[in-house]
Amino acid sequence: MMKGGMAGLMKQAQQMQEKMQKMQEELANAEVTGQSGAGLVSVVMTGRHDVKRVSLDDSLMQEDKEILEDLIAAAVNDAVRKIEQNNQEKMSGFTSGMQLPPGFKMPF
């Protein structure tokens, strides 16, 4: 490979790394809302899986503790699934031009 070609590849790799870093920051800062019980429980979570807020409908204050715990767990799980889906959608656009093997996961 010629010297200029190698320099071009290195520059391209550096640009790709910068874009990847920016994409990872965007994904980490994204917020999603997971819900359960037809919206009676909602959880706001960041792309880093940090729970920022849990909201409970007032009507749930009369419910059995176990029901409430199940609804909170379901809302958290819903938020996690939404983060994973969001990450896959964003990264598929980023990696669409790359020749990656099937099932290859990007680093996160």
Swiss-Prot record:
Residues 1-25, 87-108 are annotated as: Disordered. Keywords: Cytoplasm, DNA-binding. InterPro entries: YbaB-like_sf, YbaB/EbfC. It holds the Pfam family YbaB_DNA_bd. Residues 87-98 have a biased composition (Polar residues). It is found in: Cytoplasm, Nucleoid. Signal peptide: none annotated. Homodimer. PANTHER family: NUCLEOID-ASSOCIATED PROTEIN YBAB. Belongs to the YbaB/EbfC family. Binds to DNA and alters its conformation. May be involved in regulation of gene expression, nucleoid organization and DNA protection. This is Nucleoid-associated protein PA1533.
